[in-house]
A protein has these predicted regions:
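Short, flexible loop segments at boundaries between secondary-structure elements
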Residues: 40-57, 112-116
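Short glycine-rich anion-binding loops that position phosphate/pyrophosphate groups of nucleotides
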Residues: 18-22, 52, 93
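Active-site glycine-rich loop that binds ribose-phosphate moieties when present
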Residues: 1-7
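Short acidic, glycine-rich surface-loop motifs adjacent to enzyme active sites
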Residues: 9-23
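Charged helix-capping and loop-helix junction motifs
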Residues: 26-35
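Short, conserved loop/helix-junction motifs that constitute active-site signature segments
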Residues: 35-41, 81-83
Length: 134
């Protein structure tokens, strides 16, 4: 990894709501990063790219279907459970909280996961900061 990147200096890691299969997995499979995430998964927060059983953007839902994976936030939590202990989900997916918590993953709920404006993006960022500082 980059010598200038000191992973230990970060209090938390946030995995943004991007495609887990095409965008995130290739990055978190880098050995040094993967080892760090496995060791410090309590400091890792995933923002779900799935809301109300659909992709926020892009082909995530289609890829999940092609892999015979249920398109929901529970599947996202299962996908990341080895490297993350926290997931941010949309309020429309609150009915999954108990199932997600049974995976020993903290579930944080935001009203702002669907970002249609810059203001929505700022609100989501503020929600995540509140979760990180709780």
């Amino acid at each position: 990894m980059n010598d200038c990147l000191d992973l230990e200096s970060y209090d938390n890691i946030v995995i943004c709501p991007s495609n887990p299969f095409l965008s995130i997995d290739p990055i978190i499979k880098i050995q040094e990063l993967n080892d760090f995430l496995l060791k410090h998964k309590e400091r890792v927060y995933v923002v779900s790219p799935i809301v109300a059983n659909n992709s926020l953007k892009g082909p995530t839902a289609k890829i999940m279907q092609s892999l015979n994976i249920d398109v929901n936030v529970l599947s996202v939590a299962k996908h990341y459970r080895e490297v993350a202990s926290n997931i941010v989900i949309d309020s429309s997916d609150k009915h999954y909280i108990q199932n997600i918590q049974s995976l020993e993953i903290n579930c944080l709920v935001s009203e702002h996961l669907v970002m249609r404006s810059d203001n929505d993006k700022v609100n989501l960022a503020n929600d995540i900061l509140k979760f990180l500082n709780a």
